[in-house]
Amino acid sequence: MSNSHPLRPFTAVGEIDHVHILSEHIGALLIGEEYGDVTFVVEKKRFPAHRVILAARCQYFRALLYGGMRESQPEAEIPLQDTTAEAFTMLLKYIYTGRATLTDEKEEVLLDFLSLAHKYGFPELEDSTSEYLCTILNIQNVCMTFDVASLYSLPKLTCMCCMFMDRNAQEVLSSEGFLSLSKTALLNIVLRDSFAAPEKDIFLALLNWCKHNSKENHAEIMQAVRLPLMSLTELLNVVRPSGLLSPDAILDAIKVRSESRDMDLNYRGMLIPEENIATMKYGAQVVKGELKSALLDGDTQNYDLDHGFSRHPIDDDCRSGIEIKLGQPSIINHIRILLWDRDSRSYSYFIEVSMDELDWVRVIDHSQYLCRSWQKLYFPARVCRYIRIVGTHNTVNKIFHIVAFECMFTNKTFTLEKGLIVPMENVATIADCASVIEGVSRSRNALLNGDTKNYDWDSGYTCHQLGSGAIVVQLAQPYMIGSIRLLLWDCDDRSYSYYVEVSTNQQQWTMVADRTKVSCKSWQSVTFERQPASFIRIVGTHNTANEVFHCVHFECPEQQSSQKEENSEESGTGDTSLAGQQLDSHALRAPSGSSLPSSPGSNSRSPNRQHQ
């Protein structure tokens, strides 16, 4: 027996879902005029409708049709202005069925439809229509779409329009839609640093807009032109004959151009957020340095002593360097570089940016710091075309090596102090390329692996002999640090004493915590005046159980959320006797010149206990 019913959506047993049938039946009321009790007139076309359905779907119609006004009278005819019959037909279909077909409609109808969704208070429809408009943006429709998105404060659609116009600035300037922009929308576009068309083209487009919009204030429009970015020839032969700018304004622009540093001019640049633009895709190339081809190939795994990096000799006058030319002037505030890290060497360096290869501005200065592996660098946003990395020191030889280079604009928030990042998250992690360069452990970086649960008498900690050596952590790059947190080995009731020092070069050390006269157990929170740090040295001075200082976990800066989690979890711990367990010292490899420490249980002078 055939089934004439359409396929129904799957529902759970015991649940009935016939919403699609309801939509079809209510939608059928639109076909005829049965039961209609109100009529809308749009562009002389009559639209019969049903008050109760409109009121149930829309607060606007509820107030209009049941608010005691003239429109609430039986069989009323309501004329609607500022819309089209096509758009209103789509809206009624959506109200009655919850469906709308956008793909076959012209952009003008879709924008009218979006306007109705906004006017009558259908936020979900507004969002869905905006999302579709984002997918069909082109040179012909982007300006009128931006105008509507700005008028109704639609952030996602506005942002997508801006990104499209930024990447197609010159084509947008010459489009017919540009001439139809409102003054507010026009200024919002051309005032953006990322609207990166030549200033002469922007001036000519604004001049053309002024001719088509003669009633607007032309002086206000022309203030958006960045005259100092134009050449003397352009100012005299293009701007001056237009008569829209005073001779004083032109002379002021010439003065600024001649007296200012080039990098102080208010340049425009391409903006592509969260995407590396130092790639062949965007036309970037390495123009100075040795072994240029390796730097931008994207390979951050296959490199060794012989290949996979770019380099330059380190000289005293810093004339050598590695220079990257971007495909076009771009706005950046974030650079990532991978320093060669197949051994324990460290480097020092600085980074400068320029528009013309003559005037350079230093955005990163790590020339006095020791750095290794991945460098995650942030600075105030700059427009630049050229980027120069100059190595000033290598702890092994006189060559500076870089494996990879990336640059971009990021919307990620960051805080800078004295040119260094003030980290909010723990940067003493393996993922952030921190490492333990002094101290003994079964696993080299057990101190930094984030495991604060799985440790016992034999493993899970880093240690050093009291009176000999220390535990030293090297961060990948200098940070402004004002706190650290330690977990001292606490599988019994012993206590420790210690002090903490920080350094940027392993030569000069500053003590930030002195707990040599304090009995310390388990979690240690250390706060101090914020200062630059690349190295943190923890020196144990006393252990009530034996002659070894043991540390399970290290982080900086201190992570408050994890502190609370640890406190809540520790409240349920218990004790178990583990007398007689010893560390297999043959599993450890002590640094040269250091004596091999014993396990926490060796020479114990206190009861042996361990967390369950």
Swiss-Prot record:
Domain BTB: 36-104
Biased composition (Polar residues): 573-584
Tissue distribution: Detected in the brain (at protein level). Moderately expressed in all specific brain regions examined. Expressed in the dopaminergic neurons of the substantia nigra and A11 neurons. Highly expressed in kidney and moderately expressed in all other adult and fetal tissues.
InterPro entries given in the database record: BACK, BTB/POZ_dom, BTB_POZ_domain_cont_9, BTBD9_BACK-like_dom, FA58C, Galactose-bd-like_sf, SKP1/BTB/POZ_sf
Domain BACK: 142-240
PROSITE patterns per UniProt: BTB (PS50097)
Pfam families: BACK, BTB, F5_F8_type_C
Disease field: Restless legs syndrome 6: A neurologic sleep/wake disorder characterized by uncomfortable and unpleasant sensations in the legs that appear at rest, usually at night, inducing an irresistible desire to move the legs. The disorder results in nocturnal insomnia and chronic sleep deprivation. The majority of patients also have periodic limb movements in sleep, which are characterized by involuntary, highly stereotypical, regularly occurring limb movements that occur during sleep.
Protein name (Swiss-Prot/TrEMBL): BTB/POZ domain-containing protein 9
Organism expressing this protein natively: Homo sapiens (Human)
